[in-house]
């Protein structure tokens, strides 16, 4: 499995890669990918760590599971490949950006443009079997991605963590809120958003205001 990962992230995560749980996880994932259709493609499993260096990371958005439909997942949470129809949660993300920042809804749901600016688009589980949501949960991915959050929290300062929905909010305990900004809201899925838990959170403008206050470039959402 030829994975892409920026060297700076590799340096930070090397200890984790050598742990027994991670070796067992990778053995399981290799078997899954050889025996079943899984997403994202093998070389994109670690894509979240390949667009910006660890040093340049200034925003973390936490998702739960990759999309499990054909051709959707590209290794970045909430993102889809160019030309793929927007999933409902992504539509609601773009609607919130539209109302918050007065930006038109883009023509593509590919969020590589965010990742290139230092937004870590991290799913808690980095792979999934086709058409079986949650099929790779509780196999070790969550241990790994929790450690990613801890490393960012402990070794960086002034990062914005966007935690949407109950699952993501549980990760608050991994983050030092004395040196980072944590913004929480309901999930952008229609079930949550249509009940008033998503729209109007203004997370995108709040993120940029905080980054500018720390002397950082704002994100071009």
From Swiss-Prot:
It comes from the Bacteria. GO terms for biological process: base-excision repair, AP site formation via deaminated base removal. Its main location: cytoplasm. InterPro entries: UDG_fam1, Ura-DNA_Glyclase_AS, Uracil-DNA_glycosylase-like, Uracil-DNA_glycosylase-like_sf. PROSITE patterns: U_DNA_GLYCOSYLASE. PANTHER family: URACIL-DNA GLYCOSYLASE (PTHR11264:SF0). This is Uracil-DNA glycosylase.
């Amino acid at each position: 499995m030829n994975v892409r990962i920026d060297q700076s992230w590799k340096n930070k995560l090397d200890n984790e890669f050598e742990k027994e749980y991670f070796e067992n996880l990778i053995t399981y994932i290799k078997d899954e990918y050889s025996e079943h259709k899984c997403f994202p493609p093998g070389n994109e499993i670690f894509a979240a760590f390949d667009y910006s260096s660890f040093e340049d990371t200034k925003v973390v958005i936490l998702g739960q599971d990759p999309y499990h439909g054909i051709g959707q997942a590209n290794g970045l949470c909430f993102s889809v490949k160019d030309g793929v129809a927007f999933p409902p949660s992504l539509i609601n993300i773009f609607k919130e950006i539209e109302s918050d920042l007065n930006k038109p809804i883009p023509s593509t749901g590919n969020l590589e443009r965010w990742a290139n600016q230092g937004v870590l688009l991290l799913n808690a589980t980095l792979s999934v079997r086709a058409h079986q949501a949650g099929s790779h949960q509780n196999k070790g991915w969550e241990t790994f991605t929790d450690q990613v959050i801890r490393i960012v929290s402990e070794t960086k300062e002034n990062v914005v963590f966007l935690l949407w929905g109950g699952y993501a909010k549980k990760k608050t305990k991994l983050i030092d809120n004395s040196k980072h900004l944590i913004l929480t809201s309901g999930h952008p899925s229609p079930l949550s958003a249509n009940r008033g838990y998503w729209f109007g959170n203004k997370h995108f403008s709040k993120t940029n205001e905080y980054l500018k206050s720390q002397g950082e470039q704002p994100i071009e959402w």
